[in-house]
């Protein structure tokens, strides 16, 4: 994911590493960020997004407004980038760990996501806080879904890494938007008598599975 930009002032007494600040709308920062995640997911799973909005106690107007402010924040000229837009809404990360990726070492930061208690929002950063990747991953200790057939690929049930591990060799494909990923993989059907495995494309938004494409 490309580096972000942010024109918001520092949040809290310790700046962007302090507690989460409110969105300009008055919504708590973590709630506003969940609406940002849901806005892109609404393109493929509008019904699930409507259910999520009811769970969060907000409206579609709130969702649109939160996303509009996020996009303005991300594309503001001459604004600081990297982690600051995320920290401004999410506050201090729950965990910060070094992670080795081949010959490179990056920093992995995670935050809880109340809408999905078994997931965490993870950001991988390079030197000087440049954001490499930002997506949803399974929380440590949370049970991952059992993925064996197409019937197990339920929207919002699994992450990119989980599908890639369940159906090797999955081939990464370019997503249709900056927050989307796709994997081409071969997946058995639910009925062994209905033929062999199917070659499919699994599509993800913010790292969470959304739909199958034949």
Task: Please report, for each region that a protein language model flagged, where it lies by residue.
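Short helix/turn-capping signatures at newly exposed starts of structured segments
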Residues: 2-182, 204-214
């Amino acid at each position: 994911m490309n580096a972000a930009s942010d024109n918001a002032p520092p949040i809290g007494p310790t700046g962007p590493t302090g507690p989460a600040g409110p969105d300009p709308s008055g919504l708590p920062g973590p709630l506003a960020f969940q609406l940002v995640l849901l806005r892109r997911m609404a393109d493929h799973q509008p019904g699930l997004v409507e259910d999520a909005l009811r769970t969060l106690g907000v409206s579609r107007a709130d969702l649109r407004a939160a996303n509009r402010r996020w996009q303005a924040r991300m594309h503001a000229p001459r604004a600081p980038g990297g982690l600051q837009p995320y920290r401004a809404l999410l506050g201090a990360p729950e965990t910060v760990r070094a992670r080795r990726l081949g010959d490179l070492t990056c920093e992995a930061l995670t935050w809880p996501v109340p809408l999905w208690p078994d997931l965490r929002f993870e950001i991988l950063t390079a030197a000087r806080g440049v954001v490499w990747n930002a997506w949803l991953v399974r929380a440590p200790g949370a049970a991952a879904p059992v993925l064996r057939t197409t019937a197990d690929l339920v929207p919002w049930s699994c992450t990119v890494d989980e599908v890639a591990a369940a159906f090797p060799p999955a081939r990464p494909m370019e997503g249709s938007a900056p927050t989307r990923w796709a994997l081409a993989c071969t997946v058995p059907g639910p009925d062994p008598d209905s033929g062999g495995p199917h070659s499919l494309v699994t599509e993800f938004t913010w790292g969470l599975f959304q739909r199958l494409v034949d």
